[in-house]
């Protein structure tokens, strides 16, 4: 029998293995619901917090998953193709499968926060995550 999975988002630990070498700079990321938490097969639901200053999720894409990002706190810019799109609390951005994108907190004093999700994949590995400019030419798609 399949059961409902319930969790309090504030009780979900941040991912300890996501850092600058994979494009996650000055930020914490929670995978609230995914293949490992809740047994999802086609969806990831998460929260990201970006420290004031130079925090960002660098240019990346996921060939197997669409993504939405709902800005719940602060402001920043969404990196999209050759564009930098200003966003603030209340804005939602959507990225199609395979589209290069990222996010940068533009405030020197305020944290930015987003609720984000992937549709079409239930983990970073199955999403086909790829960093645009990998550190030292390494492949970070796994």
Q: Can you describe what each PLM-predicted range is?
A:
Residues 82-97:
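Short acidic-glycine-tyrosine-enriched beta hairpin
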Residues 37-38, 64, 108-110:
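Short strand-connecting beta-turns/loops that link adjacent beta-strands
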Residues 47-51, 61-78, 117:
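Short, conserved beta-strand element in jelly-roll/cupin
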Residues 1-43, 58, 128-142:
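A short, N-terminal "cap"/entry segment at the start of jelly-roll beta-barrel domains
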Residues 37-41, 50-56, 75, 122:
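Short, charged/polar surface micro-motifs in flexible loops or helix N-caps
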